[in-house]
Structures are given as structure tokens and as C-alpha cells.
Design a protein with these regions (language model features):
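PAPS-dependent sulfotransferases, especially Golgi type II membrane carbohydrate sulfotransferases
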Residues: 1-9, 160-181, 185-204, 210-284
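PAPS-dependent sulfotransferase catalytic core
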Residues: 1-86, 138
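Hydrophobic/aromatic beta-strand patches that form the interior of the parallel beta-sheet core
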Residues: 8, 32, 121-124, 203-205
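Short His-Asn-centered micro-motif
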Residues: 11-13, 101-105, 126-127, 207-208
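PAPS/PAP-binding and catalytic site of the sulfotransferase fold
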Residues: 17-31, 114-117, 136-137, 204-229
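Glycine-rich phosphate-binding loop used to anchor ATP phosphates in small-molecule kinases
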Residues: 81-110
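Conserved phosphate-donor/acceptor-positioning beta-strand/loop module used by diverse small-molecule
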Residues: 103-104, 117-137
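Long, charge-dense
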Residues: 142-165
Length: 284
């Protein structure tokens, strides 16, 4: 297998800063961003890897081969290449990219396997659940509320029931916000707090910390042999291309309460159920 030594993987929940981080890194000349190869509907084979728990790929050869092609820059797909120069298929020309930045939003449960199997550094970016869920609920992508991929994995169902006393197959009576909270917990609490995935080339970083301190971004680049653009300071605060137009990041309006007390209570209940201490709970 070829060495993927020009690569970095960015994982995180949708609307948690993955696009902003990946785009900020990929602004550098000849850095190529591979955008969401795990998209279930915009790619032909993204369903092989979205919302899947894998410790390795011995029972998932199709997923392994798909990822191998992605990392080798051999998947010709407009969604994945949306941030690339696609004229004359330049995005597939070998030798041009100095770095590949691969951004995922549905592979948190297999990020460690990708790191081990392909030897690619991983940055798992997390954002507080309230802002993440509010942003997800604003864009209302149908797949965000669909927990069926998780529910079909009996080993994952058993793990969640054993560790948290919760049956993810029984969520029909849950509200949309509760389902988004369950997704956030599965994608972040399980790999970070339960499995405690870590390593010298596997980093967990908070979106809030990164946005507030440009020096943290520069340190991240140093640690992973990335080169920030010269005018980084002038673009660092810019929103990503995926920021919702009604977001206060764009409108610059004063931030208001995201949810009612009743809604906060339901989110807090799920967070408590999953024993999460990644962020403090909203006091009511």
C-alpha cells in the first residue's frame, strides 16, 4: 500500500467547524481539499463508511478499497472536488498537490481505524453541543435526524446499552432535538470519552479554543507539517463556505438563547445519559 504521507484527516460532527478548519488549512497553494467522501447521497460509495463503527477493515474490504482510492486521489466526484480546480480534471492530476486535506463528518467512529490502517494523522474537532445542534437544526439535513445506520450495527447497539443503559433502537418518541443530541453523543462522547482515542498524530481540539486563538492553529500546523497561508491573520475570522446565512457568525447580530428551557432540559437529559463531561451543561 502506498504511503499517504502528504495527508491529514479532519473529522467531527456536522456543523462543528470541520469545513472552517479544512478550508483554512487548504487555502495554501497546492493544498487539495477532499470534501466529505462519506456523504451518503452525493457520492456513489459514501454509504459504505457513513456512521459506521470500525476498529479495522478486515470485515469491510469495500470500505477499505473505497478509502484507499479516496486517499490516492482516484475518486472523480464533483462533491468531493467542490473546492478544487476541476477544469480539464486538474484535480486528479498527480504530482500537483503538496498536501491533501480530507474532511469527514460521518466517520468519527472509524477515525481511529483510518489512522491506524492508513497511517494518516487525524484531527477530531469538537464544538459545544448546543451550538452544534442549533446549527444542525437550522440546516435540517434529513440524514442528521436519521439514526438508522447506528441502529443496524448490533455491536454498537449493545455497546450503548451496556455503557449507558440506553436503547438507540427505541427513539420513535424522541423529538428532533433529542435525536440530534443522541447523534452528537455517539459521534463525540464514544470515541473521545469512552474509548479515549489519542496518539501523537491523533488530536482532539475544541472549535471554540481554535477560533479564539490563532496561535493554536499555527501550533497545529507545526505539529502536522502544514504551512499556513501568509495572510492568515486577515482571513482567520472569516466564516466557512458552509456557514448558514442566518448564522450570527455572518449576521454579526448579538447571540440570543438558542433553545427554550424545556428544549435545553431535553438536551441536558441526553447528555447526562451519555455521561458526557466534554462541555458543561447549560444551567436552567
Amino acid at each position: 500500500m502506498p504511503a499517504f504521507n502528504k495527508h491529514i484527516i479532519i473529522v467531527g460532527s456536522a456543523r462543528s467547524g470541520t469545513s472552517w478548519l479544512a478550508e483554512t488549512i487548504a487555502k495554501q497553494h497546492r493544498y487539495r481539499l477532499l470534501f466529505e467522501p462519506d456523504h451518503e447521497f452525493q457520492t456513489k460509495k459514501g454509504a459504505l463508511i457513513c456512521d459506521k463503527w470500525m476498529d479495522d477493515f478486515k470485515d469491510a474490504p469495500e470500505a477499505f478499497n473505497y478509502l484507499k482510492k479516496v486517499f490516492a486521489n482516484r475518486v472523480d466526484n464533483d462533491w468531493i472536488a467542490q473546492n478544487s480546480n476541476r477544469k480539464w480534471k486538474r484535480h486528479l492530476w498527480p504530482g500537483i498537490p503538496l498536501k491533501f486535506v480530507i474532511k469527514f463528518v460521518r466517520t468519527n467512529l472509524m477515525a481511529s481505524a483510518m489512522h491506524k490502517e492508513f497511517g494518516i494523522p487525524v484531527v477530531h474537532i469538537i464544538r459545544n453541543p448546543y451550538d452544534t445542534i442549533a446549527s444542525q437544526h437550522r440546516v435540517k439535513f434529513p440524514w442528521l435526524y436519521d439514526l438508522s445506520h447506528f441502529q443496524k450495527q448490533e455491536n454498537l447497539v449493545a455497546l450503548i446499552k451496556e455503557q449507558f443503559g440506553f436503547d438507540i433502537k427505541d427513539v420513535s418518541s424522541f423529538t428532533e432535538l433529542e435525536k440530534l443530541t443522541i447523534r452528537w453523543c455517539i459521534e463525540n462522547v464514544i470515541p473521545i470519552e469512552l474509548w479515549k482515542v489519542k496518539g501523537s498524530n491523533y488530536r482532539v481540539i475544541r472549535y471554540e479554543d481554535l477560533k479564539a486563538d490563532i496561535k493554536l492553529f499555527k501550533e497545529l500546523c507545526d505539529d502536522f507539517s502544514l504551512k499556513p497561508i501568509e495572510n492568515l491573520a486577515s482571513v482567520y475570522a472569516n466564516p466557512s463556505s458552509k456557514t448558514h446565512p442566518k448564522s450570527n457568525i455572518i449576521s454579526q447580530e448579538e447571540k440570543t438563547e438558542l433553545f427554550s428551557n424545556q428544549e435545553y432540559g431535553k438536551i441536558n437529559r441526553i447528555m447526562t445519559l451519555f455521561k458526557s463531561h466534554l462541555y458543561p451543561l447549560k444551567e436552567l
